[in-house]
Curated annotation (Swiss-Prot):
The gene is HRI1. It holds the Pfam family HRI1. Belongs to the HRI1 family. Disulfide bonds: none annotated. One of its GO terms (cellular component) is cytoplasm. It is found in: Cytoplasm; Nucleus. This is Protein HRI1. Keywords: Cytoplasm, Nucleus.
């Protein structure tokens, strides 16, 4: 089922915190984007790049293994990753192994370990707490009862992927009213080559951009009605393929 997860807390070390408005979009087929814009900017580097991290992946890059009732292992190899794109020092490379545990409240606890100094050095454990939102609502409504959760499973799920050979990599995932996108210019490796999107469809059918970042952000598709899987769209000279539509 398509999902829109909001992160409630993030912990590395002994003190939990949350400095971002992090949403993760997961399509019906398992493609995913996690967009993590900072709420307050506390340094020059944060002003230059106002995101904790952004990554996106296809369903071929995630492995899900059930552990027990309400517990699964999910191992990720991200296709698009700002840390890798910018070649930031002391950041993890390669597969990220995580354990996800469903809580009675509807929240989901994620536990994992990253290796910012390489796989031969000690890892750094982390904890993230998530809660699914109703993707069909304009407001940020937490899913915590069977009826609204059942309705949320019917949410629209559309995925656009940049066609190869154009000098860009990109993914846009639409879950219900919400859309998130990642677009990067190949061979740039600076913040100038990165573009991000987060929009919400309002009650009157118009779309409001909550995040529209980057000099090429106008190349994101922002109209999502009438597209079937296998369709194509060109936006300001950039061609996108619809790889999923329910």
């Amino acid at each position: 089922m398509p999902q829109l997860l909001k992160r409630l807390a993030f912990q590395v070390g002994s003190v939990p915190n949350e400095r971002t408005t992090t949403f993760t979009s997961i399509s019906n087929d398992g493609h995913h984007i996690s967009l993590r814009p900072l709420v307050n900017l506390n340094s020059t580097s944060e002003e230059e790049f106002p995101f904790e991290w952004v990554f996106a992946g296809l369903n071929t890059g995630v492995r899900v293994v059930p552990i027990s009732e309400g517990v699964v292992e999910q191992d990720f190899n991200f296709w698009l990753d700002t840390n890798c794109y910018l070649n930031l020092p002391n950041t993890h490379r390669g597969e990220v192994k995580t354990i996800w545990t469903q809580w009675d409240s509807g929240s989901v606890a994620e536990n994992g370990e990253v290796f910012p100094n390489g796989p031969d050095n000690p890892g750094v454990p982390f904890f993230e707490l998530w809660h699914p939102l109703d993707p069909n609502r304009v407001e940020q409504v937490l899913l915590n009862d069977p009826l609204t959760t059942a309705e949320a499973t019917k949410a629209r799920s559309i995925v656009f992927k940049v066609r190869e050979g154009q000098g860009y990599d990109g993914l846009v995932i639409v879950t219900g009213r919400w859309a998130q996108g990642f677009l990067s210019k190949q061979g740039d490796a600076t913040v100038d080559g990165l573009n991000f999107l987060r929009t919400i469809e309002l009650e009157d059918g118009s779309r409001e951009a909550l995040v529209l970042y980057g000099s090429d952000a106008e190349k994101f598709p922002q109209e999502y009605l009438g597209y079937e899987s296998g369709a194509h769209v060109e936006v300001h000279g950039l061609k996108w393929d619809v790889i999923e539509s329910n």
